[in-house]
Amino acid sequence: MSPTSVTSPPDARYSRTVTWTIAIATLAILFDGYDLVVYGTILPILMDDSSQLGSISAGQAGMLGSYALIGVMVGALVNGAVGDYLGRRRLMLVNIVWFSAGMGLAAMSTSVEMFAAMRFFTGIGIGGLLATTAALVAECVPAAKKNLYNAIVYSGVPAGGILASVLAIAFRDAIGWRGLFWIGALPVVILLPLALVKLPESPRWLVSRGRLDDAARVHATTGIPMPTEADLAHERQIEKVGFAALATRRYAPGTALLGIMSFVGLMLTYGLTTWLPKIMQDAGYNAKGSLLFLVVLNGGAVLGTLIASRFADRRGPQRVVATTFGLAAIALILFTMGFPIAVLLALVAVAGTGTIGTQVLIYGFVSNYYATSARAAGVAWCAGFGRLGGIFGPIIGGAIVSAGLSNSITFYIFAGVAVLGAAVTLFVPQARSRDRGAATAGAPMMGVPATA
């Protein structure tokens, strides 16, 4: 099939494709968020009842929280290395199966060692999904709304956290922690069949690999635009593919700073989501009351991110990300000052926007910073290197709890980390090789006549 024979399909077809793509991607990321937060909801049970997996100290609990994140780092980096060669759709399907299997195996764990191994295994699938989803979304949605759609998809992370927290409050006593993990295995049953039918490949990626006929077929079927001639000229300036492109002079400074931003964002995200229920329980709240703080943290992230993403589309993500980091620092400091419960919950919601929500915005920032040939690698770099921060977050919280220090120390440390994140964000250089889809909205598409 010749790409020159394809004309631009009706907008309705493209709108349906975008809707399905965003829905599938959001559900996949929601279960990722569920997986990464559900551990914090069951941590008090595992620490208080040695009959579950054995005796677990605070230090061991922090390490168990980090094993999944080590897996995420490995999965993101591996998928980033191959994602710009193998495509977005194929890897998303593989990773849905992978992390679902990991959750089911974790539910059957009979020892701390087996549980740790399965958390690592699950993390590999989650990391792969996080790395490939942002690239697919960036290449399939309208350029003018990339940050908004990215925020919708990655708001699945805090939405999954809300789901994990609510289900733990409602059903943890009835189905136990193993039942909560079995819920995390459902995507292989309810999401995979849908993704097999409705999830498209990116025409932009297909063109970048020289598969013009395949790209034209996807374009004709889904309405996803082919890249413009200006896009292709821009892509030819990027001589290397994948991680090799990240080390070029064009990208190296920004890549380093974006990695630090993600490191900070994920340190805050996983430090708080792992230890907030335990800290609030130690502060005198009952089990369900302490989980309520986790619900509000993630709820604030969902709402705040959707609002912030609109500003990011209009004014650019850089200043918006720096601002949300700053909001996190302020909220965490104020959280130590003994305000009434209503004020504390409001501060937790703001902290959710500034921590979990900021990381969502960072994914959007990163996915639109790189050219197609380096996009999956760029997202994978930030998701992978950032997981080092996610690993240290729970460990830092565990060390503070083990040392018997004031809970305020935890919040002060995380507030300082947020200030660092804001400062680093402001120094990221402008992307000289950013996607030019918005700037070339009226340009002729590759293989499509301008009059089509």
Predicted stretch roles:
Residues 118-155:
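Cytoplasmic helix-loop-helix junction between adjacent transmembrane helices
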Residues 1-34, 38-39:
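Cytosolic juxtamembrane N-terminal segment immediately preceding the first transmembrane helix
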Residues 90-104, 319-333:
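Structural signature of the two symmetry-related core transmembrane helices
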Residues 40, 247-305:
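Extracytoplasmic gate region of multi-pass secondary transporters
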Residues 1-11, 196-254, 436-452:
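Intracellular cytosolic loops and amphipathic helices of Major Facilitator Superfamily
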Residues 87, 108-114, 142, 338-339:
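Helix-breaking motifs and short loop linkers at transmembrane-helix boundaries and internal kinks
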Residues 147-173, 187-188, 385-393:
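Glycine-rich segments within core transmembrane alpha-helices of 12-TM secondary carriers
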Residues 40-74:
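Extracellular/periplasmic helix-loop-helix junction of adjacent transmembrane segments
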